[in-house]
Amino acid sequence: MSAVATYLKTLTARRTIYALKPELPGEITINDIQSVVQTIIKETPTAFNSQPNRAVILTGETHKKVWDEVTKAIESPAGQKRPASARDEAFGSVIFFTDDKVTEKLKADFPAYAAAFPSFADHTSGAAQINSWVALEAMGLGGHLQHYNGYIKAALPSKIPESWTVQAQLVFGTPAAPPGEKTYIKNDVEIFN
């Protein structure tokens, strides 16, 4: 199988999996996950090589405490279901950030592009998120991406720098059930010569 075919197979295998068990599969350790996420944060392309991506991994009591605070902060019982399942059914969460100090420095250094830099930071964060999700899936983990950003920021340990803006949460664990069927829209990529 060619490298591209292997890459595409890995990419298409990545699915949203909500049914998780709070354990790691096989011989996978949290240090393996940390190493993979660290490499992805380092190697994901960024505008002007600015490297604004940051990440932390929550496990154990910290993972449960953060998601418990998120659950309690949401008033609607229906709205509490997803963060409660993240707390109770997942092994951990990768919390993705962008460092606003980096974005502000870019704005000052390159004022002609100042309005674009926040979007550039969002784009590179999205790239790091999907790269991490695909990699964790390839390791045998299941996961789902969440965006309880303000709630998460308020619940995180105090040693997280204030300049870090929460972008997303990749909740992960061992899959407890296969993903549901995925449907596709017609969305052909056209070639114009």
UniProtKB/Swiss-Prot annotation:
Q: Where does the signal peptide begin and end?
A: none
**What protein name does the entry list?**
Putative nitroreductase HBN1
Q: Which InterPro entries match?
A: Frm2/Hbn1, Nitroreductase, Nitroreductase-like
- List the residue ranges forming a coiled coil, or say none: none
Q: Which UniProt keywords apply?
A: Acetylation, Cytoplasm, Flavoprotein, FMN, Nucleus, Oxidoreductase
- Primary residence: cytoplasm
The biological process GO terms on file are:
cellular response to oxidative stress
Single Gene Ontology MF annotation: oxidoreductase activity
Q: Does the keyword Oxidoreductase apply?
A: yes
**Any one annotated GO CC term:** nucleus
* Organism encoding this protein: Saccharomyces cerevisiae (strain ATCC 204508 / S288c)
UniProt entry tagged with the keyword Ligase: no
The record's EC number reads 1.-.-.-
**Compartment(s):** Cytoplasm; Nucleus
Question: N-acetylserine (modified residue): where?
Answer: S2
Q: Name one Pfam family in it.
A: Nitroreductase
Which family is this protein grouped under? Belongs to the nitroreductase family.
Entry superkingdom: Eukaryota
Cofactor(s) for this UniProt protein: FMN
